[in-house]
């Protein structure tokens, strides 16, 4: 979401060209060297925000949740467009942006110098605090991922983006590092097989067309036209819609609820 927010930030800057833009975020490293932001504050660590930045100031405050918008719940528009609409700024097909310094690239690149061209996979996603090691709504079934690995392992060095607690695959090398080092890895890769998670947003920000596998979430809402978006087949079983959520499926759900056999 923070990476997608850089596209919204660009749209805000396009409308408010002379504004002093302050971003409050839990992921400040996403906005390093971004020319569209003047200052970054870390969410939950700064007091006096109202006194210092709002009271008596001629400003606009953008505190919106696109996940509660009608167009998101009905899956009728891309999330970036939805977010721009909520902020009352024109959406002109802005894409996420990542700004890597030369020193960052030179530091991380040697870690990914392998003996074959690099193919990056991200079969599972989700934040560190997510309790599910496998989330059927977004994660690739292990048997499918293993078939992909087997097909490419002789030609490519396969680097696996994963959390520490997620499953590993033979004939892969784990990439357990910051998202900025992952950005360098993606820049160095020749092929990418990703899911609806951080790496596909980083790839879009870097202008790297990738194959993205979609299981339960919508490529229309979360995806990018530059990618080869592959939708899952129709479920074998009827999806249980008798739940407490406002959207068709939650972003995280246990394997016991999976409608595929």
Regions found by a protein language model. Give the residues of each.
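Catalytic machinery of carbohydrate-active enzymes
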Residues: 1-261
